[in-house]
Amino acid sequence: MRILLVGANGFIGRHLLRTLQAEGHSLVATSRSGRGAELPGVAWLSLDLTMLAADPSHFQWPQGVELLINATGVLSTDARQLATVQDRGARALFDLAADNGASVIQLSALGAGEQPDIPFLASKAAADDYLLGLGVPAVVLRPSLVLGEGGASSQWLSRLSPWPLIPLLDTWARAQPLHIEDLVAAVLALLRQWPAQPCVLPLVGPDALTLPELLDQLRAAQGWGPARYLQIPAAIANPAVRLGDRLGWRALNTQVLTLARRDNLADAQAMKAATDFMAAPLTSRLNEWPRRELSVAASLRPVLLAVLVLIWWGTAVVCLGPGHEWGLRIMAEVGVHGWLARMAVVGGALADAVLGAGLLLRRWRRHALRAQLALMLAYMLIISLWLPHYWFDPFGAVAKNAVLLVATLWLLWTEPEVHRR
């Protein structure tokens, strides 16, 4: 079958792409950049649903496509952006499919149509309803929380999993998570056994789990025992999510808090009745993900960044305040006095402050880490040449820079690239 896979660079799209290609299907894959994994039998095209919503002629429908799979989704709290991409952009895509006689699988989300106060779900539901009213062969697949390597929610959960005490927004709401392998298998089941009429199918795991129960399953898969959980008091959670709304945080905002406090459940038998497929228990899928060493690295990374920020800002404050005279005495030891010494101490403090701030901005983080490496090496070289006695400090103040060098290098090498999908 010739399939148009939209959103092929996303978490779900990447897994679908590889499996459908391995099954022998001819694929036209899209991303905003028009680039992605180079696989035999896969052609890449550029498609931006924001532009398609404004101009349906933005995208030329590929010849011979029999099935459209829409795997796009936007992690956003901006209701206008969600309506543009997930509703109007999807509608324009469905119109193209209808005009060209293609069937459609719409990957929606469990809860769409039932929680209109959640912009993410409301925009999905609007597109779902439009598709079902077009009169084309269509299936709206509404999966629960999908887990597996590379997913945003999966990364957040794996980052939480190593800690023995875990604070959560809610500890009682239940969901039915499933593994990405089961979502892919469900799509394959639809291709083998297409429903007679356009329909909505919930896709859920067989077990209803609270977030602590889910995290304990992930911990067990990595060799840890159960953790202890602390529900964040509303007096702390509510102001925090309002701040998240203002700053555009994806992991902490009003939408996330509302979802975290609600059950999101469905009948696992509905999918089985339609396609004879049912998702496996999550525990049976936790083989290659999560991986203990990656979870620990992801968990400690923000802690290490925060510590480095505090160190750089701390040295800046000390040099400008209580340690200023000490800094001048050190400059005198290398023969620098007067205004030049004061400029050197103040300039060094300001440089430290700027580098600490650079760590907080993702777009500047790589540059800041490289500059930190250069600055620390320069400091150590100057000390080695002109102030070698500082190497013999009983507290190892200079020698400890070796640890900071390694930590900074690790952060630089593991800093994720920002790609345009």
Question: Each PLM stretch: what is its role?
Answer:
Residues 25-32:
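Conserved glycine-rich Rossmann-like NAD(P)H-binding loop of the short-chain dehydrogenase/reductase
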Residues 253-324, 339-354, 360-421:
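Extended, low-polarity transmembrane helix blocks
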Residues 72-74, 84-128, 132-134, 138-144:
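Conserved Rossmann-fold NAD(P)-dependent oxidoreductase catalytic core, especially the SDR/UDP-sugar
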Residues 36, 42-92, 96-98, 110-114:
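NAD(P)H-binding glycine-rich loop region in Rossmannoid oxidoreductase-like domains
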